[in-house]
């Protein structure tokens, strides 16, 4: 197996670069089409119903039919909107979603028509920071969509999304720091190479748990889908959008889901490395086989997104903000200090660093769970001691006094 050097990218012939770009684009589109269909099937199964089963054999062409339907629908532009910003917002959301996948390694070096090339479009010395920066741009499309729509509900959805990204982008970035410390690089291909022996999910479990929570909040998915909460904001930031403009927002959402899943695979699950015991077999991590392992790991995270949507109710906005600022960020900072100390001990010649770090990771995860359980208990205690609600007969906002028939005198 050969790990690509970031300095060697950019030397492929133009047709090979074009082919790899087209391959990444097709991979994302097919993943989105499959994810939408599989999500609807899983939700149907969990809700004891069939799900889509009419278009094509067993409903396999439902996503394609939905795409054609959206393309043929009339594109309405509401009166009073800022037209150019209104039309540009979906484009601003969807383009960064595709750009982030440019530095994700899908496999090792392979031979394509006699040319040796990495299954990766490009790489940078700060590739992970590039992904963090590019994915942050997508929120501008959501905020502009809410502002340009000229309606209160989309505006509130856009503001919620901006606050959500600010809060959880910090926790997500802090979860990367421990990976940088252990890998010694910010290059995605370098991080994958550093996990040749031990995956970082075992060494850096608290960082993985923080990232797992942050990626759900970053993508505005249930139970953190507050910018488009139907019960509060109708449709949120895309209430006034229809036709292909709405389809672009949906495409951006599912591409972002795929991107954060691929990044989790790259940082914590060994990237394209085969899982044990498959990795023992000769050739499991060479040629085109790693693309299969990478895709399977990405789908594992996509199923996690779907499972959360089917099982958990939406959180309140104050609970969501409290989770990010009062739990995830402090835990990340404490964990970074532990990892940096352990790494310094290793550099000083300490030999049992792997076992020690795994033990510390377990202790830190237990402490984080205890803190979360204690906070939940305190909140329940406060709720149980709250004063009883006033009888509706006497009137209490928002219920006016109700007419009550006086009992007849005995």
Curated annotation (Swiss-Prot):
Its main location: membrane. Keywords: Cell membrane, Membrane, NAD, Quinone, Translocase, Transmembrane, Transmembrane helix. It comes from the Bacteria. One of its GO terms (biological process) is aerobic respiration. Residues 384-410 are annotated as: Disordered. PROSITE patterns: COMPLEX1_ND1_1 (PS00667), COMPLEX1_ND1_2 (PS00668). Disulfide bonds: none annotated. One of its GO terms (molecular function) is quinone binding. Its EC number is 7.1.1.-. It is a multi-pass membrane protein. It catalyses: a quinone + NADH + 5 H(+)(in) = a quinol + NAD(+) + 4 H(+)(out). It is found in: Cell membrane. The keyword Cell membrane applies. Belongs to the complex I subunit 1 family. NDH-1 shuttles electrons from NADH, via FMN and iron-sulfur (Fe-S) centers, to quinones in the respiratory chain. The immediate electron acceptor for the enzyme in this species is believed to be menaquinone. Couples the redox reaction to proton translocation (for every two electrons transferred, four hydrogen ions are translocated across the cytoplasmic membrane), and thus conserves the redox energy in a proton gradient. PANTHER family: NADH DEHYDROGENASE SUBUNIT 1 (PTHR11432), NADH-UBIQUINONE OXIDOREDUCTASE CHAIN 1 (PTHR11432:SF3). NDH-1 is composed of 14 different subunits. Subunits NuoA, H, J, K, L, M, N constitute the membrane sector of the complex. This is NADH-quinone oxidoreductase subunit H. The gene is nuoH.
């Amino acid at each position: 197996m050969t790990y690509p050097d970031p300095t060697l990218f950019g030397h492929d012939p133009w047709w090979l670069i074009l082919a790899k770009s087209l391959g990444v684009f097709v991979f994302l589109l097919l993943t989105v089409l499959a994810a939408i269909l599989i999500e609807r099937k899983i939700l149907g199964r969990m809700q004891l119903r069939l799900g889509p089963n009419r278009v094509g054999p067993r409903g396999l062409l439902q996503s394609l039919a939905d795409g054609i339907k959206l393309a043929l629908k009339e594109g309405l532009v509401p009166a009073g909107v800022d037209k150019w910003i209104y039309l540009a917002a979906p484009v601003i959301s969807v383009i960064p979603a595709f750009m982030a996948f440019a530095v994700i390694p899908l496999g090792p070096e392979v031979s394509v028509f006699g040319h040796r090339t990495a299954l990766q479009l490009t790489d940078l010395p700060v590739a992970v920071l590039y992904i963090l920066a590019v994915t942050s741009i997508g929120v501008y499309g959501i905020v502009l969509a809410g502002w340009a729509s000229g309606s209160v509900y989309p505006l509130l959805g856009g503001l919620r999304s901006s606050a959500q990204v600010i809060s959880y982008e910090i926790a997500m970035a802090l979860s990367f720091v421990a990976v940088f410390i252990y890998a010694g690089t910010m290059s995605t291909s370098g991080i994958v190479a550093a996990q040749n022996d031990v995956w970082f999910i075992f060494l850096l479990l608290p960082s993985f748990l923080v990232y797992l929570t942050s990626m759900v909040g970053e993508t505005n998915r249930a139970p953190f889908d507050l910018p488009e909460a139907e019960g509060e904001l109708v449709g949120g930031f895309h209430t006034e959008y229809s036709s292909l403009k709405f389809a672009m927002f949906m495409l951006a959402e599912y591409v972002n889901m795929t991107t954060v899943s691929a990044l989790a695979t790259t940082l914590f699950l060994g990237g394209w490395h085969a899982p044990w015991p498959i990795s023992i077999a000769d050739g499991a991590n060479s040629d085109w086989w790693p693309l299969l392992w990478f895709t399977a790991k990405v789908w594992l995270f996509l199923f996690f997104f779907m499972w959360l949507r089917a099982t958990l109710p939406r959180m309140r906005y104050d609970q969501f903000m409290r989770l990010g600022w009062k739990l995830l960020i402090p835990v990340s900072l404490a964990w970074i200090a532990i990892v940096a100390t352990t790494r310094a001990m290793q550099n000083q010649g300490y030999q049992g660093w792997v076992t020690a770090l795994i033990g510390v990771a377990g202790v830190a995860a237990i402490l984080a769970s205890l803190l979360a359980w204690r906070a939940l208990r305190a909140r329940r205690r406060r709720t149980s001691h709250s004063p009883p609600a006033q009888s509706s007969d006497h009137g209490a906002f928002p219920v006016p006094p109700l007419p009550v028939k006086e009992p007849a005198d005995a």
